[in-house]
């Protein structure tokens, strides 16, 4: 029996081989104990403050909104050590791994940000680290691959399937099922079998707690909307968490990729079906026969065919709204923020920003306050963007 509820409504659960159940029960017990342990909590927040660099600022974008009555604030997770929100929860999971006397970390990564974060935490806590990454993502994210290796991680190229995050998740789970007695599987998002979605939310909820305190200090009121990109959904659930019971619109932005109508997207909440995948019941992209379909996004971190179960639940009860943004729209937002504010966002975060800009342009005279979770910085994406812009320039020249 579990100690915590493994479901969010009808979503979630523990759909894994029987061999992994003892590992999940052990993880849940240690997590429950850690929540009650004041020394664990004190140590965790000490690492967040003095190692990771929390709290992160809430930045008002004056240039971006000039000429409108909209005020857009960025929650600056890009300024966290490691370059993204991922660092928050890996510190917590690494501490749990040490508490459970594990010697090795197994992780999966898409954009490489979770891989970098896992390598950071493993180095800090003197743990071996093995990271599974799709071969396509290795090509797309070479700077992050080098960072991981520099910090002592072994990066395993996954050649099977579509060679992206979905396949890396599958290989990491296979490894863990063989080695769970000595290894901890450090999931990078608020997805997977219970207790992972609950653990990741707990170790990311300070994003929302800080943002609420900061917006009240700056605006003396809560925002009209919180906007965050959604792949697996950890940055979104982290910032949503402290606003779920408030009168604030929660907007998750999925990748529309090349356009929903093309089928090349990663938007399972609005264009998928409920199914079992990655140890959980949630929304996922499926064929008529029930096979997992390939997801698509310019952003490796959103290139995932499913989503965390709490997002499926929030969607089903209409507490959060989920929309989608295309590659082209995200790329435009990436360039606009870089030029207007001198902040280069991750392509993942650019999806959330693009939707905020869409709302702003829709009614520029409306007084409204948005918080966009800038979940990561765009250093990792500059080579991808450069190549796309080069191709675009060549097309224009040939016209």
UniProtKB/Swiss-Prot annotation:
Task: Please verify whether the record's keywords include DNA damage.
Answer: no
Which co-factors does it depend on?
pyridoxal 5'-phosphate
Q: Which residues carry this modification: N6-(pyridoxal phosphate)lysine?
A: 86
Give Gene Ontology CC terms.
Answer: cytoplasm
Kindly state which keywords UniProt assigns to this record, in alphabetical order.
Amino-acid biosynthesis, Aromatic amino acid biosynthesis, Lyase, Pyridoxal phosphate, Tryptophan biosynthesis
Q: Its annotated pathway?
A: Amino-acid biosynthesis; L-tryptophan biosynthesis; L-tryptophan from chorismate: step 5/5
Q: What class does this enzyme belong to in the EC scheme? A: lyase
Spell out the reaction equation it catalyses. Answer: (1S,2R)-1-C-(indol-3-yl)glycerol 3-phosphate + L-serine = D-glyceraldehyde 3-phosphate + L-tryptophan + H2O
EC number, as in UniProt: 4.2.1.20
Q: What are this entry's molecular-function GO terms?
A: tryptophan synthase activity
> Mind telling me which InterPro entries this protein's record contains?
Trp_synth_b_CS (IPR006653), Trp_synth_beta (IPR006654), Trp_synth_beta/beta-like (IPR023026), TrpB-like_PALP (IPR001926), TrpB-like_PALP_sf (IPR036052)
| Known partners and oligomeric status | Tetramer of two alpha and two beta chains.
User: What NCBIfam families does its record include?
Assistant: trpB
| Similarity field | Belongs to the TrpB family.
Query: What is this protein's function per UniProt?
Result: The beta subunit is responsible for the synthesis of L-tryptophan from indole and L-serine.
Q: What is this protein called?
A: Tryptophan synthase beta chain
What gene name is given for the protein in this entry? trpB
């Amino acid at each position: 029996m579990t100690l915590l509820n493994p479901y969010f409504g009808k979503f979630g659960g523990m759909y894994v081989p029987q061999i992994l159940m003892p590992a999940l029960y052990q993880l849940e017990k240690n997590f429950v104990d850690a929540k009650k342990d004041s020394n664990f909590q004190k140590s965790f927040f000490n690492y967040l403050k003095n190692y990771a660099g929390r709290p992160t600022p809430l930045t008002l974008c004056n240039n971006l909104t000039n000429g409108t009555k909209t005020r857009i604030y960025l929650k600056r997770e890009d300024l966290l050590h490691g370059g993204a929100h991922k660092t928050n929860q890996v510190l917590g999971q690494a501490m749990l791994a040490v508490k459970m006397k594990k010697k090795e970390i197994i992780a999966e990564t898409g954009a490489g940000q979770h891989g970098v974060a896992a390598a950071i935490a493993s180095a800090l806590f003197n743990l071996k680290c093995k990271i599974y990454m799709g071969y396509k993502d290795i090509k797309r994210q070479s700077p992050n691959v080098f960072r991981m290796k520099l910090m002592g991680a072994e990066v395993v190229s996954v050649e099977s399937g579509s060679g992206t995050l979905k396949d890396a998740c599958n290989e990491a789970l296979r490894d863990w099922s063989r080695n769970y007695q000595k290894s901890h599987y450090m999931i990078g998002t608020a997805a997977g079998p219970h207790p992972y979605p609950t653990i990741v939310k707990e170790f990311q909820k300070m994003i929302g707690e800080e943002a609420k305190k900061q917006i009240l200090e700056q605006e003396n009121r809560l925002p009209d909307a919180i906007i965050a990109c959604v792949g697996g959904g950890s940055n979104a659930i982290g910032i949503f968490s402290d606003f779920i019971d408030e009168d604030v619109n929660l907007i998750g932005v999925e990748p529309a990729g090349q356009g929903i109508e093309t089928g090349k997207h990663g938007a399972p909440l609005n264009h998928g079906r409920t199914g079992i995948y990655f140890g959980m019941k949630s929304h996922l992209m499926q064929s008529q026969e029930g096979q997992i379909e390939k997801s698509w996004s310019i952003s490796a971190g959103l290139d995932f065919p499913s989503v965390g179960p709490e997002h499926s639940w929030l969607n089903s009860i209409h507490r959060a709204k989920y929309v989608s943004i295309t590659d082209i729209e995200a790329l435009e937002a990436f360039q606009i923020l870089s030029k207007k504010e001198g902040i280069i966002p991750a392509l993942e975060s650019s999806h959330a920003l693009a939707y905020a800009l869409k709302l702003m342009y829709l009614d520029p005279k409306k007084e409204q306050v948005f918080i966009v979770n800038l979940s990561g910085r765009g250093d990792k994406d500059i080579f991808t963007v450069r190549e796309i812009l080069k191709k675009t320039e060549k097309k224009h020249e040939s016209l």
